[in-house]
């Protein structure tokens, strides 16, 4: 069971002071509208995050992804629902050092804008992935995503 830690901000500050990273990232807890814990996010942040990591989907929520201002580009506003995915990739392309805090950085409301517009979001994300990772590799990975999603739905971890 996840419990909010009162020293999360201090741990983030310590991590930044120790490694001087361009990006700091962590984990995401899903909560309901009354901020009650539901579960940890199904996709966990990888130990070592890189541009290549996002070939497997958005492994880190942008809210749990803290970027040094000097390397942070503007959001690409042609994307209505997946600009965060594109933004995270572009940030990682610019980053020299990326540090995992191993902390839950955010409580994420389970029903956000992207969730409410899932089909449009998935189309945009597919387009972004084709641009960065190639059309054929993206298509093949999406076959795997379909299997992964079906398993998650079947096991109740959608």
Segment roles from a protein language model:
Residues 1-5:
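Conserved small/polar residues in nucleotide/adenosyl-binding loops
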Residues 14-18, 93, 97, 131:
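Secondary-structure boundary motif
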Residues 24, 39-41, 100-101, 137-141:
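Short, hydrophobic secondary-structure boundary micro-motifs
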Residues 30, 102, 142-144:
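Acidic catalytic patch
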Residues 40-120, 124:
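Conserved nucleotide-sugar donor-binding catalytic segment
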Residues 130-158:
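Membrane-proximal basic amphipathic "stem/tether" segments
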């Amino acid at each position: 069971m996840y419990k909010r830690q009162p020293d999360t901000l201090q741990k983030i500050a310590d991590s930044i002071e120790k490694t001087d990273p361009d990006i700091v990232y962590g984990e995401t807890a899903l909560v309901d509208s009354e901020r009650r814990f539901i579960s940890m996010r199904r996709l966990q942040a990888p130990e070592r995050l890189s541009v290549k990591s996002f070939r497997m989907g958005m492994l880190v929520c942008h809210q749990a992804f803290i970027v040094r201002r000097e390397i942070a580009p503007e959001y690409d506003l042609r994307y209505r629902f997946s600009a965060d995915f594109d933004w995270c990739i572009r940030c990682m392309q610019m980053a020299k050092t990326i540090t995992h805090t191993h902390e839950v950085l955010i409580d994420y409301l389970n029903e956000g804008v992207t969730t409410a517009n899932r089909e449009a979001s998935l189309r945009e994300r597919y387009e972004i992935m084709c641009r960065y990772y190639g059309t054929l590799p993206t298509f093949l990975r999406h076959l795997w995503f379909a299997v992964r999603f079906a398993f998650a739905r079947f096991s109740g971890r959608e």
